[in-house]
Amino acid sequence: MTQRTITLIAGPTVSGKSALALQMAQKKNALIINTDSMQVYDVLNILTARPTEADTAIVPHYLYGYVSPALHYSVGQWLCDVRKLLTTFTSKSLIFVGGTGLYFRALLEGLSEIPHISDAVRQKWRLRLDKEGAENLYRQLLRIDAVFAEKISSQDGQRIIRALEVYDVTGKKLSWWQKKKTPPLISPNCSEKILLIPPRQWLYERIHKRLDNMIERGALEEVFAMKKLMLSPFLPAMKAIGMPEFTAYFDGYKSFEDALEMAKTQTRRYAKRQMTWFRNQFDEEWTLISSCEEV
């Protein structure tokens, strides 16, 4: 009987990690599990570069495109869904692939059991961030939870308001909650870990080509479909690649050319942040490669 293997493949957007996962899954007779926070959402098939029907016909893919964009899907919910898959497929080899570093970390290290934060509280703090700015809220966070505040940048608005909303709801510091973790679903020693980071210029050229291709394939129709849902701009799905820029185009605030160029710029910046995070957070147990050919 072939021994079950678990493989983790992380990398920035457009790096080729999905193609690598497909290639390895065929060799290992494995299932592919989404480890990307945007690819869980329905509607956003093209904008989030979900696997094609041809890909899913070759290898079974799980946790893709099954969550309503109207929901605020969390890493905790993703872990619950992964746990169900691990229970269902007890002997099947698995490949986790994606670009969301926090998902990989939660998978290998466990997750703090922070109570649910309501959409109303989330929206309250996002409005305050827009009105007061990250610096002002960071000073408030320093008074409440200096331990966590000193770990992050004073410009990191999302993590600042995350800590503030947790304190708002629970009355306890985020640094306190982070000490209370669930056991990891996968032992770090029982998996093959691959970090795919291609040369930056190659990656940027791929980003430009992919966005042009997304437009040709109907990305604007997806944006329009999302607009018709009249969702809160604070929902994660509304921040998918191209959504803010092309929404501004439909609303008459940008020309199509400016929206496309801004989408390319923001995607390059996102890829750069991903690469920085992976390099800083992942240890030497991850095998660093620059192309699929190295596997």
UniProtKB/Swiss-Prot annotation:
Substrate binds at residues 13-18. Its EC number is 2.5.1.75. Belongs to the IPP transferase family. It catalyses: adenosine(37) in tRNA + dimethylallyl diphosphate = N(6)-dimethylallyladenosine(37) in tRNA + diphosphate. The record marks 100, 122 as: Interaction with substrate tRNA. It is an enzyme of class 2 (transferase). Keywords: ATP-binding, Magnesium, Nucleotide-binding, Transferase, tRNA processing. This is tRNA dimethylallyltransferase. Monomer. ATP binds at residues 11-18. Its cofactor is Mg(2+). It comes from Bartonella quintana (strain Toulouse). The gene is miaA. GO terms for molecular function: ATP binding; tRNA dimethylallyltransferase activity. Catalyzes the transfer of a dimethylallyl group onto the adenine at position 37 in tRNAs that read codons beginning with uridine, leading to the formation of N6-(dimethylallyl)adenosine (i(6)A). InterPro entries: Dimethylallyltransferase (IPR039657), IPT (IPR018022), P-loop_NTPase (IPR027417). GO terms for biological process: tRNA modification. Signal peptide: none annotated. Transmembrane segments: none annotated. PANTHER family: TRNA DIMETHYLALLYLTRANSFERASE. Residues 36-39, 158-162 are annotated as: Interaction with substrate tRNA. The keyword Glycoprotein does not apply. It comes from the Bacteria.
